[in-house]
Amino acid sequence: MDKYIIKQNTKGQYQVIKEGNKRATAVFENERDARDYALERRTIANEKELDRKRSGRAILNFFIGILGLAIGLVVGFIGGNSYLNLEDNHNEPGIISTDVFSIHFLELGNEYTGDSIYIKAGGNDILIDAGSRGNSAQAICEYVDDYCEDGILEYVIATHAHQDHIAGFVGTSNIPGIFDYYKCETIIDFPLTNASTKVYNEYVLKRDAEVKNDGAKHYTALECYNNEDGAKKTYEIGDGITMSILYNYFYDHETSDENDYSVCVLFNDGVNNYLFTGDLESEGEEKLVEYNDLPQCKVFKAGHHGSKTSSSIKLLEVIKPEIVCVCCCTGSDEYTDDNAIMFPSQPFIDRVAKYTDLIYATTIVSNNEERFKSLNGNIVVSLKDGVVTVNCSNNNVILKETDWFKKNRTWPADGK
């Protein structure tokens, strides 16, 4: 069976090279197109129809042809180049293998800022949030389908009740939401909210239907933290990999700031830590530090899309992040006309720069018809052989080296 290698050249382009050949068979500007081409070049055998577990899935994909012989996908960095090897190392059809543990910060298919993070840990598929709008469900599902071979999300976490974090769970009138498209086994969400919006009420209806009709388990983050009613504070999600629900003071104390109700999650691979705090604001972060013994973190999902009010000094001086991933539409005036505090904001940069310059952002505002385009694109943080690497679907350029940053932001003198 043929094997194709995807190698990034000195121009940042992605070359698809058939094993044994010296010349590239094709060259692409982004990794996703290169991978799709490589997959198409493989011999397709025993094509089958995939039995979609949810009726809503047929709206997006009536039938999916799947490879009879499994496709192995290995992404690594060798000599500064990115490689994608397609090998036969699975027995089940339609599987794109990943590293032992991978975190995917997703683009959301529109110009609006929001969060959706897909995590693959062994055989477990995890989704944290599903922003930014209902139509984002299509982009999320199309991406996750490349990795989730059985149509089941073992864990779904909704951090808080804002549209840019939950609308994709609901979907639209013609795009099925996450709860329609996938079978969700365990749903963890926020204990408190002030929300009464249409999208929140629809989220509750869809969530509860998933429990009633499909047997999902639903727990609040507080139940998880307290190990109550079958919920767990720490879940074993892979060989030596854990997912822990941290205590947030605002799980059981009311606040006027919806963001501070965010569910906070810490992953650990036995060596490295990965922190997700939703849109937790500075007050919530201070409480998080006070009530939890937080470790140094290899990866931190930037609080509240890189806003001026999150990623506070008190949190950063404890977790000392090495890699920071920002889920936002960079430079968008969606929330403000003040350039300095558009996501990712200058105050955020000033605070984070002390610890790392490995900052990545998913999307950027654009004057094109869609009003957005990829900055780094889908950001994938992978663990393989004990090494954590970052590989993005558009490019691997760190934020401070982008044209947007050079025109709109300043790197502080004491920055890395």
Give the residues covered by each predicted segment.
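Core dinuclear metal-dependent hydrolase active-site scaffold
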Residues: 82-152, 221-296, 371-416
